[in-house]
Amino acid sequence: MSNVIIFTGTHFTPALAVIEEIKKKEPWEIYYLGRKYTLEGEKIPSPESQILPKMGVKFIPIPAGRLQRRFTRWTIPSLLRVPFGFFKALKVILEIKPKVIVSFGGYVGVPVVIAGFLRRVPILIHEQTATVGLANKISVRFAQKIAISFPESKTFFPEGKVVFTGNPLRPEIFKS
């Protein structure tokens, strides 16, 4: 059986940098469990749903609900989608049997991380910002390692789980 890795989350650019590097160096079968559309209520395809299939990465949309801090017209429909996202993620994890899950934060990553934890799949979370978002605050309980971009972020996470990696960058950023 091949090595299977799942990427997830809504911080797509750093995830893409890691995916591109893995594709160059390792023979992993890569899946991305992400959002189908950019915003709730709009039918604009997400960048990950458009870019990754062209790279040979298997994109699977997860109908996860956003955990909102304010009540809006999307709050109730979004909360109702939370269990659907979890069960879809669990189904995918049971089918493809990943060796590891890498989450780049955001609401879509939470059900994938929890489902992976329940199936005893090792979880790595990457936090791109100096302060921790709600999704990573939830997901950190289920992760074995947390990669951080800023040293000051380590105060938000349990000791022994944190690895300072910086923010993954794509080589194109250095080209003029």
How does the language model describe each region?
Residues 7, 21, 28-81:
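Conserved nucleotide-sugar phosphate-binding/catalytic loop shared by glycosyltransferases and other
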Residues 24, 87-101, 109-124, 137-142:
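Glycosyltransferases and closely related glycan-assembly transferases
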Residues 6-8, 33-35, 103, 126, ...:
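Short hydrophobic segments within beta-strands
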